[in-house]
Amino acid sequence: MEIEPVVRISFNGNNNQNNNNNNNNNTNNNSNNNNNNNNSSNINSTNKPSVKKPINQKMISNINNQKSPNPLNSSVDDNNNTNNNNNSNSNGTDEDIIKLARDLTNTFGILLGDSDQPSQFSDVIFKVGDRKFFASKIMLVARSEYFKAMFTGSMKESSIKEITLEGVDPDVFFTVLKYICIGILDLDYDHRMVSSIYQYCDLLGLQRGKELSLATMGKIAQMYLEKPDVESALFLWDSLNQSAIPVESVHPHLRAFVLQYASISLHCDAFYSISLTTLVQMLRNDGLRMEELDILDCVIDWCRENSQASIQQQQQQQQQQLQSANGASGKSHGKRSSSSHLKKHDGDGGSDGSCSSRCSSRRNSLSLKDHHRQHIGNGGGGGGHYNNNDCHSDTEETYSDIDDEEHRNGGGGVGDDFENDSEDGDDDDEDDDEDDDFTDDDDKDDSANDDYEYSTNKDDLDIIEDWDTTIDKNLLDEVLPLIRWENMNIGEAFERLDNLKIIPDKEISNLLRHILKSNRGESFSFLGYHYRRPRNNRKRPYPIEFLLGITQPFDSNVTNEIIPLNSFSSEFGQSTNQFLYRIKKDIKLPANLERFSFKDREFFVQLKEREKGQLAVYLAFGSKLTKPLAISVLASVIGFRFQDSIEFSFKKMFDEGFDSAWGWPKFISLDTLYKQDKYSHYSDSFCLLIELTSQWG
């Protein structure tokens, strides 16, 4: 709440100026007169009291207690301004302060207008889009440094009546203008609207408005996590990136939440509308729980959806570059390659025109093939890339010097030269030293694409005509190197890449050989990028049925639920099935959970409380075994963020006639399970995952 603009204003009516030395009874009489004239909107009303007592923390606390928690604003609640102790002069003054704040809100409302006709006291008109807003300069100057500089400096806006503002939504401007004039910031649960209000408050220097907006976005994020609503959480993350708001400042677990539910977030409709920045952050993170081939399919689909917009943006940038080049250097300099795109230059990159021979731009036009080749002799160009700062090392050391030397010697890249890349012993020694200091953290951006160099091999400039022409190759060059290719099965990777037709057949063959090299700890190259060390494996993915299961609300007719998950492996005669229990925290122990079938046998889970408040979990048979059975069992209590999960496993050969239960007598502390949110889903339940694998029988 913005208190200062409210409590620093003192109303001095004509009847009060000559009565400053009256006793307390006169003060109380003036307060009564003020109550009778509470609806007046005149600032100079003769019935307003003079606030003589200095403002203390108790007064501010009482005002803070009046605000309504929803919507989040800094207004005074009219229904909570009654004081039970009317005989105390201090309490009477507190009431006056509360009424003063309310009157201030009502009074300065006349300075705010949103109609075709200006209000009586407005002296400036803002035109935002197709709407006009009327306001008072004195209020704007008093509350915002931005408007203070606009109206008190030498800017042309200080002398004109109507000001046109661009780059702001009319609804956002009206919300912030209302907050400036009457101290009310109306925030709903639309994260796009709230993030825009945050940005505009930041522009105007309204610190308290930023705090209120940030707090609201934190509540929105918490609501998405508790539902849970993966698609909306992904929307929020992308909105924060577009608004340049740090994700962790809104909610510390928002990023990890989206990554843990990757099987949902990468297949939802919201995924295809996220920005390139958000996609790159997702692919860089080791906490992305999804199989690499599935990630590849989702990335290709995203590139198809966003290629048209990307191509249009590149064409606009190229036109602007050509226009500026024509104006500065003449017609000859204006005929640059149409396959060149906007680039960020490294501090140590020596580019003298050879940037048009980059792998990321050389494949757009068959007619420009010769133009690309004529620049090869100039050396490898250094350009900016989303992958430029990826590094596992905690030090500031980079490979720029090594890259320069390699470029001068002809560079090492894909094709026939990839064998030379792995023979650089000095580089490998440096990488080994840095690997010792590496620590993994799912909550932070992390990538093993530590460094790369652009290939200058002429054989790499061949253009494949049967590529998928619907995809922007520049987008592919940005995101494909972030895929963890070495995590793939070679046969599946070849089949998938061959069907997609997104890279040349020669590069597919080289890629498969490089996958084998990376598995041996050697250098890894792909699409002209040279990776200094193999990347880390991602975390274990969960089946999509599991993720969908724990994101659905409980059936109100049952206490607990069991969700059978599809079999996800079957080899060498083994079969594996998972069964997900969702258990209410208030379940009465001991309890027998719902039954399920596996290998034509009936099983169920028993929960018991053991000594010292320990939860015991047992696997029980529905009937006696008619023949021996060998199985392995994995039981897991799935934490809200997955990495907090608790797992226990055993392998057991059950003899014929067995009809008892087998399990873990001390699984998890009940106090930990019930009281800590990290194991809670929907705040009133926890998840138990049972995984059974048959050995034989």
UniProtKB/Swiss-Prot annotation:
Gene name of this polypeptide: triA
Q: Which Pfam families match?
A: BACK (PF07707), BTB (PF00651)
Q: What induces it?
A: Up-regulated by starvation.
Against PANTHER family, the record matches this protein to:
LIM ZINC-BINDING DOMAIN-CONTAINING PROTEIN, LIM ZINC-BINDING DOMAIN-CONTAINING PROTEIN-RELATED
Q: Where is this region: Disordered?
A: 1-94, 311-455
**Compositional bias annotation for Acidic residues:** 416-453
* Family annotation (CDD domains): BTB_POZ_trishanku-like (cd18314), MATH (cd00121)
Residue ranges annotated as compositionally biased, kind Low complexity, are 12-47, 73-91, 312-331, 353-363
Polar residues: compositionally biased ranges: 58-72
Ranges of residues in domain BTB: 122-189
Q: What does this protein do?
A: Required for normal morphogenesis and cell-type stability.
Tissue distribution of the protein: Expressed strongly in presumptive spore (prespore or psp) cells during the late G2 phase of cell cycle. Present at a low level in vegetative cells.
Write out the biased-composition intervals (Basic residues).
332-344
Q: What happens without the gene?
A: Mutant shows pleiotropic effects that include an inability of the spore mass to go all the way to the top. The upper cup, a tissue that derives from prestalk cells and anterior-like cells (ALCs), does not develop properly; it is unable to lift the spore mass to the top of the fruiting body, likely due to defective intercellular adhesion. The differentiated state becomes unstable; prespore cells transdifferentiate into prestalk and vice versa. Cells that find themselves in the wrong environment sort out to the zone that is appropriate to their new identity.
Q: Name one GO biological process term.
A: culmination involved in sorocarp development
Give the domain of life. Answer: Eukaryota
Q: Per the UniProt entry, what species is this protein from, by scientific name? A: Dictyostelium discoideum (Social amoeba)
Query: Can you say what this protein is called?
Result: Trishanku
Q: Which InterPro entries match?
A: BACK, BTB/POZ_dom, MATH/TRAF_dom, SKP1/BTB/POZ_sf
